[in-house]
Swiss-Prot record:
CDD domains assigned: S1_EF-P_repeat_1 (cd04470), S1_EF-P_repeat_2 (cd05794)
Keyword Endoplasmic reticulum among record annotations: no
The keyword Protein biosynthesis appears for this protein: yes
Protein family per UniProt: Belongs to the elongation factor P family.
GO molecular function terms attached to this record: translation elongation factor activity
Pfam families: EFP, EFP_N, Elong-fact-P_C
Compartments reported by the entry: Cytoplasm
Protein name: Elongation factor P
The species this protein was found in: Solidesulfovibrio magneticus (strain ATCC 700980 / DSM 13731 / RS-1)
Pathway terms, separated by semicolons: Protein biosynthesis; polypeptide chain elongation
HAMAP family, per database record: EF_P
Gene Ontology CC: cytoplasm
InterPro entries: Elong-fact-P_C, NA-bd_OB-fold, Rib_uL2_dom2, Transl_elong_fac_P/YeiP, Transl_elong_KOW-like, Transl_elong_P/YeiP_cen, Transl_elong_P/YeiP_CS, Transl_elongation_fac_P
Domain of life: Bacteria
């Protein structure tokens, strides 16, 4: 059991049989009456964000989440296909579930997947990934102006702002949390 005093960003709780992740919370102590906590919760199954208010000290159920080592295999229309590293079973996760994280997946990448009652909820990506630039404007000699950037589409389909000297075919390191360019490989 979890109490509202344990609330922090990223904490997972279960309400009405559905797992939620705390996106934001605010402890409010009015002049009259008991304290309460306002929260923004992300439904981990469908991705919707809802607001909810809890009384201070209220008890919550911790969801039964399981973390498994998985390997990303390929994309099949709107699904991403993963393989369990222990049992070699294949598992499908929808693009809606993974959101922007799906854009950083490369064939053969090993990662941890969060499961709820055997169904995939989320993946833990490495802090950075190396991807190849598939499309961008060509660099011109002398493009070394500090801070100037241009958009580049990467091999997985995501678009990242890169410095002017980056060309098609270059392998770049991208931060998976912010989507920022880190450097060339």
């Amino acid at each position: 059991m979890l109490s509202t005093t344990d609330f922090r960003r990223g904490l997972k709780i279960e309400m009405d049989g559905v797992p939620y992740e705390i996106v934001d919370f605010l402890h409010v102590k009015p002049g009259k009456g008991g304290a309460f906590i306002r929260t923004k919760l992300k439904n981990m199954i469908n991705g919707r964000v809802v607001e909810n208010t809890f009384r201070s000290g209220e008890k919550m159920v911790k969801p039964d989440l399981e973390s498994k080592d998985m390997q990303y295999l390929y994309r099949e229309s709107e699904d991403f296909v993963f393989m369990d590293m222990e049992s070699y079973e294949q598992m499908h996760a929808g693009a809606a579930q993974l959101g922007e994280k799906g854009g950083y997946l490369k064939d053969g990448m090993e990662l941890k997947m969060l499961l709820y009652k055997g169904q995939p909820l989320d993946i833990d990506l490495p802090a950075s990934v190396v991807l190849q630039v598939a499309e961008t404007e060509p660099g011109v000699k002398g493009d070394t102006v500090s801070g100037a950037t241009k958009p580049a589409q990467l091999e997985t389909g995501i678009t990242v702002n890169v410095p002017l000297f980056v060309n098609i075919g270059d392998r770049i390191k991208v931060d998976t949390r912010s989507g920022d360019y880190i450097g060339r490989e």
